Swiss-Prot record:
Descriptive protein name: Glutamate-1-semialdehyde 2,1-aminomutase
Subunit structure: Homodimer.
Organism name: Psychromonas ingrahamii (strain DSM 17664 / CCUG 51855 / 37)
Native organism taxonomy: Bacteria, Pseudomonadati, Pseudomonadota, Gammaproteobacteria, Alteromonadales
Gene3D superfamilies membership: Aspartate Aminotransferase, domain 1, Type I PLP-dependent aspartate aminotransferase-like (Major domain)
Pathway: Porphyrin-containing compound metabolism; protoporphyrin-IX biosynthesis; 5-aminolevulinate from L-glutamyl-tRNA(Glu): step 2/2
Amino acid sequence: MSISNQLFDRAQAIIPGGVNSPARAFNGVGGDPLFIEKAQGAYIYDVDKKSYIDYVGSWGPMILGHNHPEIKAAVIAAVENGLSFGAPTEIEIIMAEKVKSLVPSMEQVRMVSSGTEATMSAIRLARGYTGRDKILKFEGNYHGHSDSLLVKAGSGALTLGQPSSPGIPADFAKHTLTATYNDLASVQQLFTEYKDQIACIIVEPVAGNMNCILPQEGFLQGLREICDANDALLILDEVMTGFRVALGGAQAYYDIKPDLTTLGKVIGGGMPVGAFGGSKKVMQHIAPTGPVYQAGTLSGNPIAMHAGLAALTALDRPEYAQLAEKTKKLALGLKRVAKEENVPLAINYAGGMFGFFFTEAEQVSNYTQACACDIEKFKKFFHLMLEQGIYLAPSAFEAGFLSLAHSDQDIEDTLTAAKKAFSML
């Protein structure tokens, strides 16, 4: 029995399911999860002293690679002055100014401690600003585990086959409307049916929680037009895509201006940070300047702010362009070696994120199509790659992530392993 196996046995006795977030449990692929001891650059190292090329990147934040020296130095320096004050600090201002400089639609920014807090707060703000109760989201889009948003969701909820969670009252869930991703007609139909009742549309501009599904041409622009025509707000959930699809997020990549944006993952440099922001007109409705209440003891934590600022500063350099080039090389390489081994594979990628689907279909563009892919084949592929030292997301419904630390050799080694794995399916 490996040390990871032993630790998982201990964990299950004291932690529900042995993990503190369901996707980590390997339920989506079978077997016991790896317990990680350390990480450096593009590699993670488990407690059994095995190394892996990592394409999970802590589920997105590690865009610079693990244990980045500038982030580590910033955290160590900040710790010298204390861990948390519960009072304003200058670093919060500097961090917010940096976010605004990269994402101009965020004229004002409120820091929180997680992506779930960011989306939950943005939804409350949209409801308070418009005076409407209903919100519209998309099947397979995941926006955190708050009650309003855990309806027909993606990510770990989809992996576990529970896209809508018990514990959410029907009277509450009825205010969450769901449409089909990449289908504007389904959106328009709901706005017609619930005229003047919908506060906002919230959408992952690239759906990274039902694997990696790209918006079809005109989809995001169509959502903007529908919101404008109905006096509803458009919220782009960029917790995953922010600073990863492009330095200015998916909104820069696809040239779309939202009313509100939510951020997480990359913004914290590995620390627990989230943020939401938008036009000053809307953000002025947040307490203490407005009536919509939102608060958090550790919001704007100075250690997290220093880590996040170091991460964004390091990203804001010419080398950032290499991220998309590395991702394209990996994605097209996977497509090529799969074809060489006669394995049907669909590939999607944008910026520094990618996804692949075992399917005969040329394109996967919504929740139904993602669920129709060969999940059993993915499970086999996952373990064949893991045995060769390649760590992929342990679920067919999660996107993969590259970092600037991944070398050309890392990618070549990954493709060599993938070719062998495809040949064994």
